[in-house]
Swiss-Prot record:
Lineage: Eukaryota, Metazoa, Chordata, Craniata, Vertebrata
Cofactor: how and how many bound: Binds 1 Ca(2+) ion per subunit.
PROSITE patterns recorded: PA2_ASP, PA2_HIS
Name listed for the protein in its UniProt record: Acidic phospholipase A2 H1E6
GO CC field: extracellular region
Subunit structure: Homodimer.
MF-aspect GO terms: calcium ion binding; calcium-dependent phospholipase A2 activity; phospholipid binding; toxin activity
Positions with a binding annotation for Ca(2+): 43, 45, 47, 64
Known tissue expression: Expressed by the venom gland.
Presence of the UniProt keyword Endoplasmic reticulum in the record: no
Length: 139
């Protein structure tokens, strides 16, 4: 019975975009996005420029590029639906725009998880903008 309850809880969709992305990050990395990724490297957080500093920063660069390709809605505001299944994220819903946003966030959260071994809080947290002057890679 307990297993069925856990499965039911894990399949509940979440609403509210920023909360959704934060929850994805926590589920995949066991770290809060706000404190672990908001001011990391040259791309994690609002904006972004220069060359990504490490694999985690590259996750944010790719996420920014992904948002740039979303059409017909605001990627930072539109709420979408998803579930956590078998340790992964599955985007749902019928709205193509919301699904694109979800896929961008899913890919970033999974990328953060896959690069935890190179995450360097001491070196890249609140990284100086003056160190992000190299030419950016193209999306």
């Amino acid at each position: 019975m307990r297993t069925l309850w856990i499965l039911a809880v894990l399949q509940v969709g979440v609403e509210g975009h920023l909360l959704q992305f934060e929850t994805m990050i926590i589920k995949m990395t066991k770290q809060t996005g706000l404190f672990s990724y908001s001011f990391y490297g040259c791309y994690c957080g609002w904006g972004g420029h220069g060359r990504p500093q490490d694999p985690t920063d590259r996750c944010c660069f790719v996420h920014d590029c992904c948002y740039g390709k979303v059409t017909n809605c605001d990627p930072k505001a539109a709420a979408y639906s998803y579930t956590i299944e078998n340790g992964g994220i599955v985007c749902g819903g019928d709205d193509p725009c919301k699904k694109q946003i979800c896929e961008c966030d899913r890919a970033a959260a999974m990328c953060f998880r896959d690069n935890l071994d190179t995450y360097n809080y001491a070196k890249y947290w609140k990284f100086s903008a003056k160190d992000c002057q190299e030419e950016s890679d193209p999306c």
